[in-house]
Amino acid sequence: MTKMNVESFNLDHTKVVAPFVRLAGTMEGLNGDVIKKYDIRFKQPNKEHMEMPGLHSLEHLMAENIRNHTDKVVDLSPMGCQTGFYVSFINHDDYEDVLNIIEKTLNDVLEATEVPACNEVQCGWAASHSLEGAKEIAQAFLDKRNQWSDIFGEGK
């Protein structure tokens, strides 16, 4: 397989076992700042996916709430394949802490009573949301917390 510019295109999606959180990239800026991008994979690639209303609400909830647990988040974005999200941190390289931040954020999702910015002024497709769908996705991921570090299903 020819090496491609996009990191995830070089990942053999048939070898990973979701759910997991993996370091997907590191970039150093000219002034020494380091950005680490993580792949938060909720669903098994090419086998299952998140339905868009739940995924969309999960995106809003995670993007808003993760910033309550750290000031190091640069961005949190859904994958187009609907199997996960990317989250990027600046000058933060503690993987276990990243897992804890994600866990706290998903617990916030379970406690939510509404989806933030779920209106036509603040959202580009406000009609496509499901708080219950987001909670179901979050709970399923949290239920397998002990597997998050085992990217290839090796029991590590």
Curated annotation (Swiss-Prot):
Gene3D superfamilies: S-ribosylhomocysteinase (LuxS). InterPro entries: LuxS_sf, Metalloenz_LuxS/M16, S-ribosylhomocysteinase. GO terms for biological process: quorum sensing. Its EC number is 4.4.1.21. Fe cation binds at H56, H60, C123. One of its GO terms (molecular function) is S-ribosylhomocysteine lyase activity. The keyword Metal-binding applies. It catalyses: S-(5-deoxy-D-ribos-5-yl)-L-homocysteine = (S)-4,5-dihydroxypentane-2,3-dione + L-homocysteine. SUPFAM superfamilies: LuxS/MPP-like metallohydrolase. Binds 1 Fe cation per subunit. Keywords: Autoinducer synthesis, Iron, Lyase, Metal-binding, Quorum sensing. The keyword Lyase applies. NCBIfam families: PRK02260.1-4 (NF002604). Involved in the synthesis of autoinducer 2 (AI-2) which is secreted by bacteria and is used to communicate both the cell density and the metabolic potential of the environment. The regulation of gene expression in response to changes in cell density is called quorum sensing. Catalyzes the transformation of S-ribosylhomocysteine (RHC) to homocysteine (HC) and 4,5-dihydroxy-2,3-pentadione (DPD). Belongs to the LuxS family. This is S-ribosylhomocysteine lyase.
